[in-house]
């Protein structure tokens, strides 16, 4: 088993082929597979585990002495939905999970390291400074997903995206193959090529331009004091298509309101699960805001119950964690003047709420798709949702559909107050983000599960060319959608038009060309590449080479 050498270069290297059958390295199965059990790096020869930023430089140089561009991948949390890290092409992995330093720099501000997870950084920022990143909730997802991937979460309506607060990054780049890698610090005020490199990290995705080692924030929002949380379960028994439309209409109306501290997660599980669930969260910072939040939830719940009476919580539902269900019957804390909050409604200190909702779900085989929505669902889409969440496809049983769902996340608010080109995240009009999900256990069920989610998605967007194209004019109007979310990658989008350029257009809209410019400057040899990585050629240049 590999150990740190006497002269520590800031990394260790694990030679996959050095073990023997009777004494295999116990780390290798974990080092060669991501969270999605569909993806395994079957041809990996070396794993470099880095512990210092300079070690990341050296590890990249050593890897490139043995491997060709495009066969070295970076891993942190390992939650990538597609095989962008673990596929048959990868020969070397640079694992940055040893980079976990965090703190405060007098010149650069708060910083967290790229090897840390959402939960690790939350504990540090909250414990030491009372600050938070307004990112997602899945505890084991690496910071690349929550920051450079354009992540968002329950505080995004109130504070915007994490990239809106990003002020600097420390990143290893290797623009010249024959020269040593360089550790650079670039920031919001950087100009020229350095400015393009910083901007590319404000949502341009991890593993595209170099190896990120640290993220810096000149300032961060203060943590809320607490959160009022409603956990509303609905039975499929007796539920109708029209009731679903009414419920979604109310949900969209709430998303358009001015209550930036209120956010929702609506997980519509397949009928086979027998129930589905809506979570509503309102954060507060003082007693006055707390009473307003409690009163708001009382009226929201009463309004929703006019459509359908909530049922008792029964069990934690499966799936890749968004904001995971609460435990059954947590202890209530009624300390306000009112006492009419439902049993499913809780008053949590912010730290406790974050602990409650930060699950990542079980490691399964999975497939995902996404869409940003500016307007309500057209009637035709309600019909499609009802069809695919109530019918059991050929080749699957009802029991095997229990972990299939459409997740409807509420956003807007401060996200809207940033220009589309201020960061690489161009989507600044959306109020809802959809995540289509399905999960299963066995490889022999891959094809039928993939067919179900692909058919669902294509039928949802059939009038728009099979994808949520922002530019397609139909009877319901233009601008219903704002493309797709890069952090929920979907290789099927490469089949839409112009290969991966079409997919990247849906992810980055008008920001794609500037990302291509940064790629050409800082990774011209495409060391870092995958099925949907940023290319070095524009679409016009690409077509000229075909």
From Swiss-Prot:
GO terms for molecular function: beta-D-glucose oxidase activity; copper ion binding; FAD binding; hexose oxidase activity; protein homodimerization activity. There is a cross-link at residues 79-138 (6-(S-cysteinyl)-8alpha-(pros-histidyl)-FAD (His-Cys)). Its EC number is 1.1.3.5. It is an enzyme of class 1 (oxidoreductase). Binds 1 FAD per subunit in a bicovalent manner. Pfam families: BBE (PF08031), FAD_binding_4 (PF01565). Optimum pH is 6. A second pH optimum was found at pH 10. Belongs to the oxygen-dependent FAD-linked oxidoreductase family. Homodimer. This is Hexose oxidase. It comes from Chondrus crispus (Carrageen Irish moss). The gene is HOX.
């Amino acid at each position: 088993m590999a150990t740190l050498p006497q002269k520590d270069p800031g990394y260790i290297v694990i030679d996959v082929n050095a073990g023997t059958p009777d004494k295999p390295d116990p780390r290798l199965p974990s080092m060669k597979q991501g969270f999605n059990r569909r993806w395994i790096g079957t041809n990996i020869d070396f794993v470099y585990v880095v512990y210092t930023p300079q070690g990341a430089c050296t590890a990249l140089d050593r890897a490139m002495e043995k491997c060709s561009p495009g066969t070295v991948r970076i891993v942190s949390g390992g939650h990538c939905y597609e095989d962008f890290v673990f596929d048959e092409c990868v020969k070397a992995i640079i694992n940055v999970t040893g980079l976990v330093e965090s703190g405060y720099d007098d010149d650069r501000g708060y910083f967290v390291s790229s090897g840390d997870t959402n939960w690790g950084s939350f504990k540090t920022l909250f414990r030491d400074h009372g600050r938070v990143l307004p990112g997602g909730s899945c505890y084991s997802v690496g910071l690349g997903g929550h920051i450079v991937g354009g992540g968002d979460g329950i505080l995004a309506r109130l504070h915007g995206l994490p990239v809106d607060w990003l002020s600097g990054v420390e990143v290893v780049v290797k623009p010249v193959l024959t020269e040593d890698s360089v550790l650079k610090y670039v920031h919001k005020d950087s100009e020229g090529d350095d400015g393009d490199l910083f901007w590319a990290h404000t949502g341009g995705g991890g593993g595209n331009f170099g190896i990120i080692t640290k993220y810096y924030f000149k300032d961060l929002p203060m943590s809320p004091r607490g959160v009022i949380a409603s956990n509303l379960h609905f039975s499929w028994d007796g539920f109708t298509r029209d009731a679903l439309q009414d419920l979604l209409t109310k949900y969209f109306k709430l998303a358009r309101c001015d209550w930036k501290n209120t956010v929702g997660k609506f997980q519509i599980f397949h009928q086979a699960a027998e129930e589905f669930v809506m979570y509503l969260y309102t954060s507060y910072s003082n007693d006055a805001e707390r009473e307003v939040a409690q009163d708001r939830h009382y009226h929201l719940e009463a309004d929703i119950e006019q459509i359908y009476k909530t049922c008792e919580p029964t069990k934690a539902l499966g799936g890749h964690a968004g904001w995971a269900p609460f435990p059954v019957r947590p202890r209530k804390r009624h300390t306000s003047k009112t006492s009419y909050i439902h049993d499913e409604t809780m008053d949590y200190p912010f730290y406790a709420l974050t602990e409650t909702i930060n699950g990542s779900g079980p490691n399964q085989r999975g497939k995902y798709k996404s869409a940003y929505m500016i307007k309500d669902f057209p009637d035709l889409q309600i019909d499609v949702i009802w069809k695919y969440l109530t019918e059991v496809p050929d080749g699957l049983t009802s029991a095997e559909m229990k972990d299939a769902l459409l997740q409807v996340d509420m956003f807007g608010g401060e996200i809207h107050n940033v220009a589309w080109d201020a960061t690489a995240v161009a989507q600044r009009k959306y109020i809802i983000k959809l995540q289509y999900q399905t999960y299963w256990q066995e490889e022999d069920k891959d094809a039928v599960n993939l067919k179900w989610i692909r058919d669902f998605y294509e039928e949802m967007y059939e009038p728009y060319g099979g994808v949520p194209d922002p530019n397609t004019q139909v009877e319901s109007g233009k601008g219903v959608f704002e493309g797709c979310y890069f952090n929920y990658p979907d290789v099927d989008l490469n089949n839409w038009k112009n290969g991966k350029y079409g997919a990247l257009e849906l992810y980055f809209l008008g920001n794609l060309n500037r990302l291509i410019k940064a790629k050409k400057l800082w990774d011209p040899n495409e060391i870092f590449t995958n099925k949907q990585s940023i290319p070095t050629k524009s679409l016009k240049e690409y077509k000229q080479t075909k």
